[in-house]
Each structure stands twice: as C-alpha cells, then as structure tokens.
C-alpha cells in the first residue's frame, strides 16, 4: 500500500488528468495515454532517473524541470504537463513514483475508452482474453515467461487480439505483459479489469459455475450482489465443469462458495474424521 504522501501526489495528478479529459477528444486522450505510458517505461528503465525524480531533497519544481529537460520535444504538451505534475509531488519511495506513473497512463487509457463509449466493452475484452489465456497452458506459459522479451510477448498477444479487440484493450494487455504494478501477467489483467469497472463505478464479481448462467440468471445474481455491496456489480463468469454444480462468487476478499464440489469435499473431510 502506498504511503499517504504518495497517494496525495497521485490524487493531484489524477485530478489534473480528469480536468484535461473533460475538454479533450477520445483520440487525443488515447494518444496522451500512450505518451504517459512511455514516460512510465522510461522511469522503469532508468533507476538513477527514478531516484532523482523521487528525491525528497530536491524541490518539486526542480524535479519537474529535470523531467521537462528530458521530455521536451519528445511528448506532447498535455503528457508533459501531466508527467511534471506527477513528479512535482512528494513520493515516499522511487518505486511508488513508478507505480503512480503507470497508473496515470492506465487511467488515461480507460478515460479515452470511457469518452468513446467503449469502456464496458474494454472491460469485457480484457476479462475474456484472460479466460482464453487461462484455458490454454501453452499460451499462458508463452505470455507469462519472464525470460521472453516483453516486445516478443506483446507481438504474440497483438496477433491474437487484432481485429477482435479495441485498440485500448490491446494496449492495456501490453501494459499487463510489462508487469503492471509489479504483478504477474494474470494478476495485472485482473487488476486492469477491476480498474475499468471502478471507473464505471462498479464492483467486479468473479463467478464460477459448471455451466454458463443464462442472461436472466446473471441479471438476477448481479442485482442481488448490487443490493449487498451498495453499488452496481459487473458479473464475470468462468465455466469450470469440475465444480459439478452450484455457484462460487468472489467479490474482493469475500468468497461465497455454494458449489457441489465444496459440499462434497466437506462431506469427505467429515467422513475422514470419523
């Protein structure tokens, strides 16, 4: 968890991003997002720069000037403004600055999809791609292999997604392949799905069933969960025949396991203790 000073610095940059997004076209926001992510990549690649940009002994203006000297002429005015706003804040550790830079780029991508009216679809495409990867061990290994260059894995993902997913989705998958927030590829995809849902003011419910829920069943389940959590719920289904029946629902750290498999396991455990 980030320290309070880092959270406040990110909040200030996030507010500036929101103000920019309100007056910009979706395509412009997407282009700015890509530049913000390139800045995050630079901060990741250059540990000395990362330390300098988070150095509490330097003033915010000095840190912003340092980054301006590096980025001038290489990114647009909006990306430069947002990046310098970010580094001008106080950061408790260089790693937290990197995390903030990555999140700002992702937030801009999601904002671009939101302005274009595509955010719900992007959320679903990210989840479905994660399901495809999880269902194919060879593909999962290829995309998660830390020994393979990110560019190589991104090319593979791009070949799979081109023509089947929106450009913002493809770019977010690339972010996940880069280990967004220090996570594994699968963990990063999951977090991106949750961030997309959160921008739509929704909570994600991961539902595991033996056979797909019908549209009306899914709607009723979503409505019930919304009543419990006090906000709209985005239901994400995974089909696993091994659960045999019933339903398992995970929302955040809450798990509701009503599967037949769980009940059978409980029965076996009870019998084994006799």
UniProtKB/Swiss-Prot annotation:
The listed locations are: Cell membrane
Q: Which Pfam families match?
A: OSCP
Membrane-protein topology:
Peripheral membrane protein
Q: Which GO terms describe its cellular component?
A: plasma membrane; proton-transporting ATP synthase complex
Q: Which Gene3D superfamilies match?
A: N-terminal domain of the delta subunit of the F1F0-ATP synthase
What role does it play? Answer: F(1)F(0) ATP synthase produces ATP from ADP in the presence of a proton or sodium gradient. F-type ATPases consist of two structural domains, F(1) containing the extramembraneous catalytic core and F(0) containing the membrane proton channel, linked together by a central stalk and a peripheral stalk. During catalysis, ATP synthesis in the catalytic domain of F(1) is coupled via a rotary mechanism of the central stalk subunits to proton translocation. This protein is part of the stalk that links CF(0) to CF(1). It either transmits conformational changes from CF(0) to CF(1) or is implicated in proton conduction.
Subunit structure comment from the entry: F-type ATPases have 2 components, F(1) - the catalytic core - and F(0) - the membrane proton channel. F(1) has five subunits: alpha(3), beta(3), gamma(1), delta(1), epsilon(1). F(0) has three main subunits: a(1), b(2) and c(10-14). The alpha and beta chains form an alternating ring which encloses part of the gamma chain. F(1) is attached to F(0) by a central stalk formed by the gamma and epsilon chains, while a peripheral stalk is formed by the delta and b chains.
HAMAP family given in the database record = ATP_synth_delta_bact
Q: What is this protein called?
A: ATP synthase subunit delta
Species: Salinispora arenicola (strain CNS-205)
